[in-house]
A protein has these predicted regions:
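Feature activates predominantly on carbohydrate-active enzymes
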Residues: 62-65, 69-71, 107-199
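Acidic, contiguous N-terminal accessory segments
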Residues: 2, 12-13, 18-128, 181-184
Length: 199
């Protein structure tokens, strides 16, 4: 009896919380690789991910999860880089990341939409961001949580639901994935703390 009650409560909470965890930007990823998109994965091989190792610890955990999510989708784990040593990659960080700060200083990344904001992120592309680098997909957060939310938004975009562990939501397997170039953001939360709390 108690078990049925607990299952019922969790199911009710799921119906209330799932909309809050829904993907922010529908229809911006596809399996078509073309000049209007940034390639995230080709023939099962994901684009590497770069982060500043001195950035917030929580961001590095989200990055590792994203790298593993690429394995769930295409079969190969994304390489996590500490330095920009390849020509194309995904760059993830907060406004405190040295790589993000360098892009801002060089006027290659406009983060004005994030200034003074809480838990907000921006996903965009930058051409020729660093020496010997052609293009990067940037996931930048106004703070630690913003960067983390942006990272998990990217996980959703590649086909891994935030309910993968909770509700056995199946992963959509792909060999090719690209994200349409553009500026994607999500606003500040309507409440101070967001998430699923079970007491």
């Amino acid at each position: 009896m108690i078990r049925k009650y607990i299952i019922g409560v969790v199911a009710l909470l799921a119906t209330l919380v799932l909309p809050a965890l829904a993907i922010d930007h529908k229809g911006i990823t596809s399996d078509q690789l073309d000049k209007n998109s940034f390639t995230l994965m080709q023939n099962g091989k994901p684009t590497p991910i770069l982060m500043d190792v001195t950035d917030e610890r929580g961001i590095s955990i989200a990055v590792e999860n994203l790298a593993e999510d690429f394995r769930r989708v295409g079969g190969t784990r994304a390489e996590v880089l500490a330095t920009p040593r390849v020509s194309r990659f995904v760059l993830i960080g907060s406004l405190q990341s040295r790589y993000i700060r360098q892009l801002i200083k060089d006027q290659k990344l406009d983060v004005s939409i994030l200034k003074g904001k809480s838990e907000q992120y921006l996903i965009t592309t930058v051409n020729r961001p660093f020496a010997n680098v052609d293009e990067v997909l940037v996931v930048v957060g106004s703070d630690r949580r913003g960067a983390i939310y942006g990272t998990y938004e990217l996980s959703e975009q590649i086909g891994v639901s935030p309910w993968y562990w909770w509700a056995d939501v199946p992963v959509v397997r792909q060999q090719n994935l690209a994200i349409e170039r553009g500026n994607y953001t999500a606003g500040e939360p309507a409440v101070k703390y967001r998430g699923l709390f079970l007491n």
